[in-house]
């Protein structure tokens, strides 16, 4: 469940496998769904076992499959690389030493789709004695639009000799937000888990729901936030980027230091001018597969000084810093893979902000003392939407404030339930966030 310490448990299990269970690092494989997750696991493992963590294979599904195919990833091939790798394993076209594993660890197993499941099954078939440790939460499967299906995690749990363990202790949230989340889960059917989550904290916490008649709820949400602001971290969660941008403008109008967790609207991180400059600088001067320390520092200095006025340079600096932390030796192929699999939001630093604004999708995996959710009644109330709301609800550590014009929360026990029948307007000043898609290149033709 959320806040149960899944990441901590997995990291300690990895350390135990290596140090206590005599599993050699080359026999251990961990697969994740994002470069950010792979990096976090590597960082945490380094804190536990030191430099030995550098030799543990922690990869995304895509990067592992590109390794099996013997080439560096690109955007076109990434669409079918997992299914291709699974097919090659089944047909015996992959070198045995590349797939010979005794332990396979899968993070966020609820996000597996048909291709990832086929890969896991292929590895299991080729390694009959291989242990599979899959950790996930079917209630947090919010990527169905990408083909994920928690049913595949359930299939693994049904394998002969498998053990199913429910992690129901929540160390993140106070009692009232956890009880509220448990009640909300009754909206979701066909769940794998059956045991309610239990808060391990003594604090009661607070849950407040405000039901509106108005279509627009931006102004009262901000007023509510101003009224309840505390010293801790606060986050406003929305359904769409458009809602997030409107709330950002309104918060700044009230003088609140706020930051948004955002993407570049389809622009890949490796296509940013600052990142391309850094890669190109190294590519033109590198003599061997290994990036020398001198060349690395030279590339940093030149890139950072060239783009010192760029607001996007902070993403590149964060990327370079994380790669340095998790790679003892810097191979250019590894760095290109690291960059290719990363996204802008992976390096979005929201520290120092009084309020963070984000869509629910981008806030997954994060936590905040206070959470304010904007829930519009404009969407079909299916299981996918309910799981998305559940992810938002479980980001709150202490207090949860829900602003809605729908009826999803009417039946739940809360500390305060308010009805607001006033009509609110769309904010007079809104911010239109432009991206590269809004540039008309034809305008510059003579």
Which residue stretches match the model-derived regions?
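Helicase C-terminal subdomain and adjacent C-terminal extension
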Residues: 388-391, 398-446
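Structural recognition of the conserved hydrophobic beta-strand(s) that form the central parallel beta-sheet
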Residues: 30, 58, 131-137, 401-402
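Conserved helicase/translocase P-loop NTPase motor core
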Residues: 57-103, 112-127, 336-360
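P-loop NTPase Walker
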Residues: 1-74, 182, 394
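Conserved RecA-like helicase motor-core motifs
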Residues: 52-58, 193, 256-263
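Conserved interdomain hinge at the start of the Helicase C-terminal
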Residues: 213-231
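Core RecA-like ATPase module of SF1/SF2 helicases and allied nucleic-acid translocases
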Residues: 35, 175, 237-400, 406
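Conserved helicase motor core of SF1/SF2 NTP-dependent helicases
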Residues: 2-7, 12, 35, 103, ...
């Amino acid at each position: 469940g959320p806040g149960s310490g899944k990441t901590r448990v997995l990291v300690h299990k990895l350390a135990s496998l290596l140090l206590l269970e005599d599993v050699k690092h080359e026999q251990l494989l961990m697969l994740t769904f994002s470069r950010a997750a792979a990096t976090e696991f590597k960082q945490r493992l380094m804190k536990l076992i030191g430099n030995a963590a550098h030799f543990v294979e922690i990869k995304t599904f895509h990067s592992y499959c590109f390794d099996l195919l013997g080439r560096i990833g690109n955007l076109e091939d990434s669409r079918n690389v997992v299914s291709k790798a699974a097919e090659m394993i089944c047909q015996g076209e992959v070198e045995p030493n590349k797939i010979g594993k005794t332990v396979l660890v899968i993070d966020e197993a609820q996000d597996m789709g048909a291709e990832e499941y086929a890969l896991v099954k292929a590895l299991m078939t080729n390694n009959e004695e291989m242990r599979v440790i899959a950790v996930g939460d079917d209630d947090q499967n919010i990527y169905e639009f990408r083909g994920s299906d928690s049913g595949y995690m359930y299939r693994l749990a049904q394998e002969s000799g498998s053990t199913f363990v429910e992690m129901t202790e929540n160390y993140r949230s106070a009692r009232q937000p956890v009880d509220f989340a448990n009640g909300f889960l009754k909206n979701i059917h066909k769940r794998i888990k059956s045991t309610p989550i239990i808060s391990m904290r003594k604090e009661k916490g607070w849950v407040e729901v405000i039901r509106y008649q108005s279509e627009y709820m931006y102004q009262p949400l901000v007023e509510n936030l101003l009224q309840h602001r505390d010293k801790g971290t606060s986050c406003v969660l929305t359904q769409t980027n458009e809602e997030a941008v409107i709330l950002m403008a309104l918060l700044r109008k009230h003088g609140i230091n706020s930051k948004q967790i955002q993407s570049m609207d389809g622009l890949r991180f490796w296509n940013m001018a600052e990142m391309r400059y850094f890669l190109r600088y190294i590519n033109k001067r590198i003599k061997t597969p290994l990036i020398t320390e001198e060349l690395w520092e030279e590339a940093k200095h030149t890139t950072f000084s060239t783009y010192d006025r760029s607001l996007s340079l902070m993403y590149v600096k964060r990327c370079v810093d994380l790669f340095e932390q998790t790679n003892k030796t810097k191979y250019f192929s590894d760095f290109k893979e690291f960059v290719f699999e990363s996204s802008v939001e992976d390096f979005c630093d929201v520290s120092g902000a009084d309020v963070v604004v984000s869509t629910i999708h981008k806030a997954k995996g994060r936590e905040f003392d206070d959470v304010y959710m904007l829930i519009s009644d404009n969407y079909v109330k299916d299981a996918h939407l309910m799981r998305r709301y559940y992810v938002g609800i479980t980001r709150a550590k202490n207090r949860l404030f829900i602003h809605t014009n729908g009826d999803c929360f009417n039946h739940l026990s809360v500390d305060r339930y308010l009805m607001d029948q006033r009509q609110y307007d769309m904010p007079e000043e809104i911010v239109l966030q432009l991206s590269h898609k809004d540039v008309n290149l034809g305008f510059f033709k003579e």
